[in-house]
Structures are given as structure tokens and as C-alpha cells.
Regions:
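Glycine-enriched, solvent-exposed interface loops adjoining structured elements
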Residues: 1-192
Length: 192
């Protein structure tokens, strides 16, 4: 079942014994805390690991160097990052990986004429897989706990629990594709 941002926050609030919100616009401490913390926590969770379910790729649009502050002057080019960009996984062109680059204010600077970006994207909550939902709910509960319950002991417990859920989510995500095999390693060839 796909969960919305409100549903994720409400489940986290239930975990700590708080009243679940039905809207971020409610006039309650629960709604205010969820509204303020949720986007940052969601983006932080997405950025914390190269999630396969959130991996995207695209050719980047080259920016015109009209602003003197942005023009590197060394033959490098600026490329605009996509709006849903959260984390860079790799940068490539037709010649292979681009190893030297720099992120600058929603753009990437590199010496290539074209660039393919592999990245983690900000997705709609309904497209999160169940294992990520569980990890995000656990993290939200840990983050919401102290401001809503003022219990540092419970918050500490919930942070440990959220780390366990995060590890389980990473494992589940890693199992969503065939593992990379080392086929041409000299020591393996020597054993045969």
C-alpha cells in the first residue's frame, strides 16, 4: 500500500504515543513538528544511501556561462542538475566516467562537453517500497519523539531501532538486482 507524507508521519506519531495528524495544516504541535521536520528527514534518508529504487539517470543540460562568478575560465562547463536531484552517484560521458567534477549551486562543473548523471532522485512518497517506508517511519518516530514527548530515553531507543530498520532497508534494496561478479581477476583464473 502506497503511503502519503501525512500517512508516514501519522504512523510515526502513533509509534511514540502521540495523536496522529491528518493534515500538516492542523493547529497542533504534532502537525507543526511533522510539517517542519518531514521534508528534511525524507531527503536525508534518500541521500544517505544509493537506493536502487530511487536511482535515475539523464543527460544534463549545459548552462551558458553568462555570469562571471560561475564561469570557471579553464575550459570547464557547468551543467544544470535535475530538479529532483538528491545525491550524485556517478557522472559519465561517451568516454567513460568523469572523475573530476564539482557540485556548485544546483549545477555540476566538469571539463566534459556532455555529461550523463546517475543520481538518487526525490520521489513521490507513493513510489517508496515498503522497506523504505518502514525505515523512514522509524526515523520519523525517533526525530519526533523528543519534541513531542520530551523523553530522551525513548528517543534514544527509537534512534537505535531506526538504525536497525535502516540496515534492513539497505539490505532489501541491495537484493533488488543481480550482484556484480568479478569475472576477470587474475587470482581466480590462476586457481582454475
Amino acid at each position: 500500500m502506497a503511503l502519503s507524507d501525512i500517512a508516514l508521519c501519522a504512523r510515526a506519531q502513533v509509534m511514540i504515543g502521540a495523536s496522529p495528524v491528518s493534515s500538516f495544516d492542523e493547529d497542533s504541535a504534532e502537525a507543526e513538528i511533522a510539517r517542519l521536520l518531514y521534508p528534511t528527514i525524507r531527503d536525508g534518508m534518500l541521500a544517505s544511501y544509493p537506493w536502487r529504487f530511487a536511482a535515475r539517470g539523464c543527460w544534463l543540460a549545459r548552462l551558458a556561462n553568462t555570469d562571471d562568478d560561475r564561469d570557471p575560465g579553464d575550459g570547464s562547463h557547468l551543467f544544470a542538475m535535475p530538479r529532483d536531484f538528491i545525491r550524485l552517484l556517478s557522472l559519465e560521458n561517451d568516454g567513460g566516467k568523469i572523475t573530476r567534477f564539482e557540485l556548485r549551486d544546483r549545477a555540476v562543473l566538469c571539463s566534459a562537453d556532455a555529461a550523463w548523471l546517475s543520481y538518487v532522485a526525490r520521489l513521490a512518497e507513493g513510489s517508496f517500497p515498503p522497506w523504505f517506508d518502514l525505515a523512514l517511519i522509524a526515523r520519523l518516530a525517533a526525530e519526533f519523539c523528543l519534541p513531542l514527548t520530551e523523553s530522551s530515553t525513548r528517543a534514544e531507543y527509537l534512534f537505535k531501532r531506526s538504525e536497525d530498520q535502516f540496515r534492513a532497508a539497505r539490505l532489501a534494496d541491495a537484493q533488488q538486482s543481480t550482484p556484480h561478479a568479478i569475472d576477470d581477476f587474475s587470482l581466480i583464473s590462476a586457481r582454475n
